[in-house]
Amino acid sequence: MDTNTLLLILANIIVIIGLARLIGLLFARFQQPPVIGEIIAGIMLGPSLLGLLSPALEKSFFPATTQPFLYLLSEIGLIFYMFLVGLELNPQYLRQKLKVAILTSNVSIFFPFVLGIVLSFFVLYSLNQPNKTSFIPFALFIGAAMSITAFPVLARILKDTGLDKTPLGTLGLTCASVDDISAWCLLAIAIAVTRTDNIFGAFPTLLGIIVYTVFMVTLGRKFFKYILRNYGQKNYLSQGLLTFIYIMVILSAMLTEWIGIDVIFGGFILGAILPKNTNLSTELATKTEDFVSTFLLPIFFAYSGLSTDLGLLNKPYLWAVCALVVAAAIAGKYCGVYVTTRALGVEKQEAKALGWLMNTRGLTELIILNVGLKLGVISPVIFTMFVIMAIITTIITSPLVVKIYPAPAH
């Protein structure tokens, strides 16, 4: 790497994290999750705004020579973000209203997933898709992208609106926890099928990830309990222990990539099996989250923004398809949640609010889309449409939930 490239990468990082922080704070002032502002900041640095205003500046500031380095940093950011998602997956949520949560979450995945598959028939052959895209992998990715709920963003919305301690907050966190596990399993299947190009060929990969997950949940969990109990210095997370855990996160990511699933699953699995509700786990989350959220994730948003080009939607027909994607995603999730919870005896207002809460997609949607784009399953046009869907479904959540189900403080 020559000096000019190094300086340009450092300049990229300065602009990326600075703009992400600025736009994130701006959105927070309007009671929106800062992550939405950070996603939009990334889009602003790509062809949708910077490239539109000055194509020459965009190409010179984000040339092809720097993008591999941004990609590497964004992948590392995703590994550790997924580690945090797993770490925050608290078992106490899974024990509360479990029957309602399991039924609601699975139906709320099934409805939009089916709509996604139906939509795939239309989208695959009518839009400019990669030539070698097969229907089954494409449909699985579209279904997964329509079905996901962003647990961390949902938790942040509940906290910011003062609803985290209410019955709605408890049920929402429980449903989102179950939804998270189910949706990541669905994505794992989509990746396995895509990489082998057929369902039966994916069986060895799926068997491998099942064996690894079972191993981590049983022996791995016991091992880390022992490590944290014996090497945590009076509930203090030493640099040595922190280093060991980070090495294990990367090693777990390497193993899931080697098995044939994406690196993000390694981070998620390791975070999920670590002991929860201890001073050490809290300190681990705190030390990790600040650097990941302020430095690494904005780079991921910027890298995603370079692939998001609103200019690709240059015909009314394409915007109509985009509107159809947004409508199907919202309707599938909302109807799945509302119908199920009402059938299970949940009050009408709570069921309505939960339907909108579970529509929160945010950053989690971006992760699925980037995996699909990386594997060549979805085109930049479809990528852009689903990024728009992720932003819209997340932006509308807070105001609608507060209007339907105001917290006691309101």
Swiss-Prot record:
The keyword Transmembrane helix applies. Signal peptide: none annotated. It is a multi-pass membrane protein. Keywords: Antiport, Ion transport, Membrane, Sodium, Sodium transport, Transmembrane, Transmembrane helix, Transport. This is Na(+)/H(+) antiporter NhaS4. The gene is nhaS4. It holds the Pfam family Na_H_Exchanger. GO terms for cellular component: membrane.
